[in-house]
């Protein structure tokens, strides 16, 4: 199967200085498949993994009003430049709520450099967010662990019991 390349693909390559590598890809109009699965992405609901398993998911709106002590954004799996620019736009001109700590973990030096070059890193840091190294860290309980009994909202790909470095934390 082929997911067609589009303007988003071209923009990514341009940001990487590789726009000349863009190749339009799409399936042949007469291609035959054993099975076709069409997913209307507009019908998907945002989901969140509840403690203590990535498989323990519920619609995110069911957790509205949940107290959060800590937010960790980034990691090696969820910190593309596109995602980090969204974070910067949301934080621009705002400050982190009292009682909440926020960390940002760009997944690579390249993403960090691009954030700095375009000014987005300033917006993130001006909000009161803490910048962490481009490395394993809070995901494996190495720094920025939540408080005992705390609630941590993370964009990381794992939320197993104790993995955050705090056994009694509720990690989403």
Predicted feature descriptions by range:
Residues 1-172:
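Fe-S-dependent hydro-lyases/dehydratases of central metabolism
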